[in-house]
Amino acid sequence: VTNAQKKQPKHVMMMAAGTGGHVFPALAVAKELQQQGVEVSWLATPSGMENRLLKNQNIPIYQIDIQGVRGNGLLRKLAAPFKILKATLSAMRYMKQLNVEAVAGFGGYVAGPGGLAARALGIPVIIHEQNAVAGFTNTQLSRISKTVCQAFPNTFATNEKVQTTGNPVRKEITEILNPSWRYQEREKAGEPLRILIVGGSLGAQALNERVPEALKQLNVPLNVYHQCGQNHAEITLARYEGKPDQLNVDVQPFIENMAEAYSKADLIICRAGALTVTEIATAGVAAIFVPLPSAVDDHQTANAKFLANSGAAKICPQATLTSESLKEILAPLMNRQLLSEMAAKARQQAQPDATQQVVRLIQEL
């Protein structure tokens, strides 16, 4: 047994809460740790979606009560230090009780008290930031963490503890075939260009409203697969009325199999959440990003630039998103050879082994 093997942490506590963007990468890492025989537990908030996402995952959940402490009125600001202290003490209790040997924070407010608790107990902390602009909690925790993982380069100031790992993504997406081959096969088969529109689980209204009109004006044969979110299917389909016959449209509230949707698409129009951008790079698909304008610190634009700067994607800010402006971006892209080149550039930016990289860094703590 080498020295390194002896030292590997036997019990790792994951800290991720609030949104799928934090929880899914943490879950990918947790599953990989479990496969390697490491015991895993999860620090969560009582009402967070992580509780639902972790159902049937065979990971014990420990809850601490902490609400967001950024903004939200004077009283909450005054109460915040007491809430944080109470939550930190709860987290310390769990960590002692479980004999936690390493703590991995993936964002969400739960990671703040969790990181402080680990620090107070002398347990090493590693954090992972999914976005190109670090969130509030991770910015604070980066100072006390032993290792800092960033999905995109330049999120944190460079120093020896910062590692660019990429974002952990689902296995089905890392297994998608090479883009050059996929695009070439579609070209050989004489298939019309296939455009995928992803509005996210809620459906991005800006995309549902403006994209159909732009596509109707393009006047080229297209197969369009438009995911519009729950309750928006009828109205979105109605916006395609009066379309030319060569525009084939399939409107769906949800896409069950994202890996299949990516692999069949020549071009995707979507938001620029961290995981979406990472999945598009991993799959290798040309993209037009419409960043969510309300995202904290405009982090979606920063995420989108990661692919746009290398020529793999275009950015259309929501403020200037009209059917006309979108048509102007789309028209020159109606060429599969060009889209194939963009897809190849996207794939060059991918880090498909992100999960393994983060797991290795946890084991080296």
Q: Which residue stretches match the model-derived regions?
A:
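Conserved nucleotide-sugar phosphate-binding/catalytic loop shared by glycosyltransferases and other
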Residues: 9-17, 35-82, 228-232, 317-319
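Short amphipathic alpha-helix
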Residues: 22-33
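Active-site-proximal region of nucleotide-activated glycan assembly enzymes
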Residues: 39, 49, 60, 119-180
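Donor-nucleotide binding loops and adjacent catalytic segments primarily
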Residues: 48, 53, 57, 174, ...
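An amphipathic, basic-hydrophobic alpha-helix
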Residues: 73-102
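Acidic donor-binding loop of glycosyltransferase active sites
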Residues: 100-102, 263-278, 285
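A short, well-ordered alpha-helix in the C-terminal region of glycosyltransferases
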Residues: 338-352
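C-terminal alpha-helical cap of glycosyltransferases
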Residues: 352-365
